[in-house]
Amino acid sequence: MTSIDEAAPGRSAASDAAADVLRGHIRDIQDWPQPGVVFKDITPLLSTPAAFGVVVGALVDVARERGATTIAGIEARGFLLAAPVADRLGAALVPIRKQGKLPGPTRSATYDLEYGTATIEIHADAVRPDERVLLVDDVLATGGTAAAAHGLLAGVGAEVVGLAVLMELSFLPGRERVAPLDVVPLLTI
């Protein structure tokens, strides 16, 4: 069942509109990428410019409310959201990539997956200590990637002002794993 987290502080008309848009533009793909998983596909959202604009606008509001000076997008779908948010704000954009995808010196963080580990990286000079960074991604599920991204940014002295996501899967422990980071989902499932 999909529902808006009515108790979320700071809900605005824009975030309520974004939740309504998301309900109509997220497709469930059964048993992908493995049996038993219901994948939340944002392709219908991306292929509908007006709907995508509403969602980006709500994410821009989240960034403004938190005084973000930099937007960090988590690979890969986080890039699709973070770039237009940074553009609308006139803010810096920091890509958080899978290991081995960035040229030059990097900082990395390794985190646990269900079966193994993964590593993400940022350029060593991507963020200055005085920057206020909003992390952006499509889904908060188990929280491993978001927690690692938060650690990377905090490790260079940036102030991470929150994690904005299209959807939070509330039946998974993502929020607990990224605590005390402020999580702002546009839609809670």
Swiss-Prot record:
Gene Ontology molecular function, alphabetical: adenine binding; adenine phosphoribosyltransferase activity; AMP binding
The protein, known as: Adenine phosphoribosyltransferase
Subcellular location: Cytoplasm
Cited InterPro entries: Ade_phspho_trans, PRibTrfase_dom, PRTase-like, UPRTase/APRTase
Protein EC: 2.4.2.7
Pfam families on file: Pribosyltran
Annotated HAMAP family: Aden_phosphoribosyltr (MF_00004)
Subunit details: Homodimer.
NCBIfam families tied to this protein: apt, PRK02304.1-3, PRK02304.1-5
Top EC class, one word: transferase
GO cellular component terms given for this protein: cytoplasm
Species: Frankia alni (strain DSM 45986 / CECT 9034 / ACN14a)
Keywords: Cytoplasm, Glycosyltransferase, Purine salvage, Transferase
Coiled coil: none
PANTHER family: ADENINE PHOSPHORIBOSYLTRANSFERASE (PTHR32315:SF3)
GO biological process: adenine salvage; AMP salvage; purine ribonucleoside salvage
Catalysis: reaction(s): AMP + diphosphate = 5-phospho-alpha-D-ribose 1-diphosphate + adenine
Superkingdom as given in the UniProt entry: Bacteria
Pathway membership: Purine metabolism; AMP biosynthesis via salvage pathway; AMP from adenine: step 1/1
Role played: Catalyzes a salvage reaction resulting in the formation of AMP, that is energically less costly than de novo synthesis.
Lineage, top ranks: Bacteria, Bacillati, Actinomycetota, Actinomycetes, Frankiales
Similarity comment text for this entry: Belongs to the purine/pyrimidine phosphoribosyltransferase family.
